[in-house]
């Protein structure tokens, strides 16, 4: 070895160790200056993004200010798309009750708009634990035919991988009825299901549990009425 080997030694010393991972940048909330600009001048989409940022970092005062701003940014009347964007932004701001207020500014007719409106109304009611309003939204979505809800999959959360978690709207309606203190209505809803196999077995097991405390005669009448439908 001689002087000619020194550059190689220096290069090896300077190289990062094998397998060393780069340190990810530290996530920080929106700066105060940027937040104030969005609060005063931002549109609905910018306010919604600010809500998500404030919620991520637990900044409750920012959430409060953003909620107040979202209630004023698009005064009635507004077209359907604006009302829905405003309502979704309030939901992102953890204000489900205010979401319902904004939704009440627009009454959609039959069709896709009504479906979208009802689904967002259900989402807000579910977030607010407003069981009666959640029941109303799903029953209106069913439009008199509970079997429609059997194959209607609604997003109820996210997996650890960030993938959407879904549940049948029929099962969700039964849960809302049960949470509202109406087990007999929950039984009727569950028996409206048409999905066979494991799902049917699970629902029948739940029905059996709900019927157990009831008088046998009342239980039989309820089963007959549900099956007749």
Label for each model-derived stretch:
Residues 18-229:
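Alpha-helical solenoid repeat scaffolds
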Residues 2-15:
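Bacterial N-terminal signal peptides
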